[in-house]
């Protein structure tokens, strides 16, 4: 019964894929940060996304409303590594005018939508 239900949900497109959940800290990535990225031209965001995809530390990117053109989640080994990623990679992308960084202190809720 469970196998049939999972098959039905998968065929309907509700389940996109099965993934592993990694413990970033056990891999040495102790800093989780969210970065609001200000863009010179929001119309260039697809090109910027392609460049962000090449940065291994970036795990999510969202094109958003509000102050930021993009909101990015990344993992780094520590704050020094974070600074190197921000200054040496993200801020060097053409049309990124500035960033605002939020360091996550804890992640008390992690879940998918219930259905």
Model-derived segments and spans:
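A compositional/biophysical signature of low hydrophobicity enriched in polar/charged and small residues
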Residues: 1-115
